[in-house]
């Protein structure tokens, strides 16, 4: 992306600026496609993509596929290191129905999307952590997952 109003860089962060701006163009990190009519559809962020067993999994696609599961309030999908597959797709859920468990969510995913895209594990929280801009704080969730802090399987 380039424009007259584009930012010129990160304040005192030349390494981040070098990653984001090249030849005057901003690398947004968005992944998307153009349809036959030329409309651009943004499907996810490159940094959020999970590569599991050589297959690309877009967390936003998994989240959208499960968005209407009864009793599911919110879902955050991301990748974690996995010895066999490189990365595994996992999820953290907020539920309004206490009977909605890990097996039910994985089963719902299997019915709606390709099997390789389904979460291999689901953990539960009362609320998803948020950044100052109210986005789900996936880096915090990844750290919590790695450390096993505050995430329960039921």
Task: Show which residues each predicted segment covers.
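Acidic/polar alpha-helix N-cap and adjacent early helical turns
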Residues: 143-154
